[in-house]
Amino acid sequence: NSDPQFLADFLSSELGVNVRIHHVHSEMGKIASLESGEAHIGLMTPESSWLGWKQHGLSVMAAVQNYEETTNNFPQAWVRSDSSIALAYLDDDPSTDPISMMEGRASCHTGWLDSIGMLLPMGHLIGNGYVDTDGSSGDIESLRGLIHGFFSNESSIPGHDSPYFGALGAIRCLSEGIGEVAFSTEGIVSESCDNDNPEDDEDWCLGINQYVPISVFDPLPTTSVVYNPSTLDVRSRTAVLNALVSLNYDMYLENYSTAGGTYTGCYDISIHKVDEDSPKGECGSEVLANILDGPGIVRATSQDHIGPFSDSIRHIPGVAEFFQEEV
């Protein structure tokens, strides 16, 4: 049921017009289609949403929620609890700066140019003056030198085949003493090292109290619904947005019994009616779970949703040119 045609059918029903899927092969293809008017809305990653907004005049109308029902994912710097960095973070003394104490320490990143584990943390460090970009070449490859220059030549920037790749790999890198600070996701330590059944924990985990998260970085936004204000007028935009938000009101029920009978179908909680005829995949809850990969969708603006992300990554040398070529 992950066929995007179910989303098109849902919108067709809500809007009373024929909605079709315009197939492209890349995020830049989505941007080009929105610019030309071939497409009217696009589901886009944080990176391509930012590029579309800042470089191509596109705007955000909505955001898909993650499974914590928020529209942001926050990077964390994880350190060992017995480290001087952790002590500086926890001492309530404004004169001690845990971020500056990371200088010269080996760092663990999730991967080359990953937003959570590299771009957002480094954007914060550059934007707040911890890392000096004077003398750098100004292209995206210079970021590697900036990382090694501030942290250490021993910092881990893993490839896909490394055991230290990804959000989990960065924490393993910290746990095994490869690095002294790991840049990863917010819930990764509890998910990997603090399960109800200890046998489900990774075998390299330290005790849960031996990890300290440092939360100072701007968030990574969730998937955006992007449009071109030059080709989608206010009335049409409002209708599309209302239709998308109405996905939240549908719940698919199977053999659900109430005083009035037993039902299987799409239950609209706003009007308390069960649609027993439409395909299951077209029900809002199914579209959200299988196509949009989230529990809900909410109204958003470019500034509110992408702005904090932009505040950090705009400091990365050559990032716009890189996204233009790679997304």
Model features per residue range: what roles?
Residues 1-50:
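Extracytoplasmic small-molecule ligand-binding "clamshell" domains
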Residues 3, 7, 30, 45-48, ...:
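Stable alpha-helical elements in mature extracytoplasmic
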Residues 8-14, 74, 78-93, 197-294, ...:
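Extended ligand-binding regions for polar small-molecule ligands
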Residues 22-32, 133-172, 176, 187:
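Short helix-initiation/N-cap motifs at beta->coil->alpha
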Residues 39, 106-114, 159-160, 227-229, ...:
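Second-shell loop/turn segments in exported
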Residues 43-57, 127, 167-208:
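A ligand-binding cleft/hinge motif common to bilobed small-molecule-binding domains
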Residues 48-50, 67-68, 83-85, 112-116, ...:
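Solvent-exposed loop/turn segments at secondary-structure junctions
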Residues 62-135:
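A conserved helix-loop-strand patch within extracytoplasmic ligand-binding domains
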